[in-house]
Curated annotation (Swiss-Prot):
Record lineage: Bacteria, Pseudomonadati, Pseudomonadota, Alphaproteobacteria, Rickettsiales
Site (Lowers pKa of active site Cys): 144
GO annotation (BP), single: protein modification process
Protein's name according to its UniProt entry: Octanoyltransferase
Gene3D superfamilies tied to this protein: Bira Bifunctional Protein, Domain 2 (3.30.930.10)
Miscellaneous remark of the record: In the reaction, the free carboxyl group of octanoic acid is attached via an amide linkage to the epsilon-amino group of a specific lysine residue of lipoyl domains of lipoate-dependent enzymes.
Active site: 178 (acyl-thioester intermediate)
Length: 214
């Protein structure tokens, strides 16, 4: 249940969802939440391969313009990759009505949500406030397993985060991920953990309830 008196809709999309279509949907949904016509929502999906540029992205951080489609967005952050094998989570919550008008706390709670979920699969990770994301130590290196990029309109959140489940990590070669030169990425599969999306999603929902519905 939502703290607002009606359920948070939990939607899982089958197949690939076009990135621009997802942007249009989120814009419409935020309008509906603000106007009281629609409920808050958590949307789980996959995108076809795409590079997305947040409001802080710099041209020099796009290393290959022709590798995949490039879409500029209104979310925070820099360049990121979305594609098959990655669980994308878009979170549309009304922080104003929840009396939680604290952006840093919201982002930190997203991080705790991911860290708690990964722990259920035996993965020790941590959320980094400075280099926003969830990181693991692997082969003596810090590697990012989840990337974050949010937007907020009149205290309704949208966009969210992505977790690499079985992502082709070579797809990151065309960008400087999140603008952090020399950074490395990983996935559950890369860490030797095989998890079906359905199982991962179930734990995500359980952990969401413990963090956001208390």
């Amino acid at each position: 249940m939502s703290l607002l008196g009606f359920p948070v809709e939990w939607r899982v999309s089958d197949g690939m969802v076009d990135y621009k279509a997802a942007l249009d949907f989120m814009t419409s949904r935020v309008d509906g939440i603000l106007e009281g016509r629609e409920s808050e929502m958590v949307w789980l999906l996959e995108h076809p391969s795409v590079y997305t540029a947040g409001v802080s992205a710099k041209d020099g951080e796009l290393l290959s313009e022709n590798k995949f489609q490039v879409v500029r967005t209104t979310r925070g952050g820099k360049y990121s990759y979305h594609g098959p094998g990655q669980r994308v989570v878009y979170v549309m919550l009304h922080l104003g009505r929840r009396d939680k008008r604290d952006v840093r706390l919201y982002v930190r709670n997203l991080g705790l949500w991911v860290v708690g979920t990964l722990a259920e699969f035996g993965i020790d990770s941590h959320f980094d406030d400075d280099n926003t994301g969830v990181w693991v130590q692997y082969s003596r290196q810090a590697k990012k397993i989840a990337a974050f990029g949010i937007a907020i309109r009149r205290w309704v959140t949208y966009h969210g985060f992505s977790v690499n489940i079985s992502t082709d990590l070579g797809c990151y070669s065309g960008i400087v991920p999140c603008g952090i030169a020399g950074s490395h990425v990983t996935s559950l599969q890369d860490l030797g953990v095989t998890v079906p999306f359905e199982e991962f999603d179930a734990v995500l929902q359980q952990k969401f309830d413990t963090i956001f519905l208390q």
